[in-house]
Each structure stands twice: as C-alpha cells, then as structure tokens.
Regions:
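Helix-loop-strand module that forms the ligand-binding subsite of alpha/beta enzymes
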Residues: 1-77
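Glycine-rich phosphate/pyrophosphate-binding loop and the adjoining helix
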Residues: 63-119
Length: 119
C-alpha cells in the first residue's frame, strides 16, 4: 500500500481518510476476535503486506515532533496499519515544504524516487 498525501491540521485530506475507511475495513483488512459481549481485539488480514507513506507538512519538524508528539504517524501506524496486521511500514516525511528552496524540494523528490525504486 502506498499513500502519498499532505498533512493538513495533523490529518490527511478527507478523500484519503475516506479511502482508508472504505478499503482498510473489516472483514477484508481485519476482523475482530470477540472476547465477551462487545469486547474484543482486531486480527489483521494483511500480515505479509508493506505500507509506504509519503507525507508533506507545512510545519517545521520541531513543531510536529515535539509539540504535537508525531500525532499523524501514530494515527496511521497504530490506528490503521497495525490493526490490519501491517508492521512493515516506511514513513517518509517532508517538513516546511512551502518554505524550502527549490534545491531542497528537488532533494525531497529524489528521496521519493530512491524510496520507490527500493520497493
């Protein structure tokens, strides 16, 4: 699974979130093992799969990693992919994209290319 999206207000755009809700959903991506009543735990059906996520941020790295405790990463890794059984996750982040030089943007794109070629 490859996701490429900006992070807006510490979330992916609604169209990406909607895709996640529709595609990575039970019973295809995971199912629940019932313990008792309405209580249970997820069992992922995508255990041998890999996820690669490319995200751009308008914020600097310090704000996202320090003040907001990597919230977008934790939401995606734990709340989506781990539930589906995907633990092989490559997460590439590019910070302060609107404010960097064109040379830095070219380095970002080169990193995307290198990551994609190593699939």
């Amino acid at each position: 699974i490859v996701l490429i999206a900006p992070i807006w207000n510490f979330r992916m755009p609604a169209i990406v979130e909607g895709w996640i809700d529709k595609v990575l959903a039970p019973p295809w991506a995971f199912k629940f093992k019932q313990l008792w009543g309405n209580y249970g735990y997820p069992i992922g059906n995508l255990k041998q799969k890999k996820a690669i996520i490319f995200c751009t941020y308008g914020s600097p790295r310090l704000a996202v990693t320090t003040f907001f405790l990597n919230l977008p990463i934790r939401r995606l890794k734990r709340g989506v992919f781990h539930m589906c059984g995907i633990y092989n996750i490559v997460y590439r982040r590019y910070f302060a994209v609107p404010f960097v030089s064109n040379e830095k943007r070219k380095k970002f794109l080169e990193d995307v290319k290198k990551t994609a070629l190593n699939l």
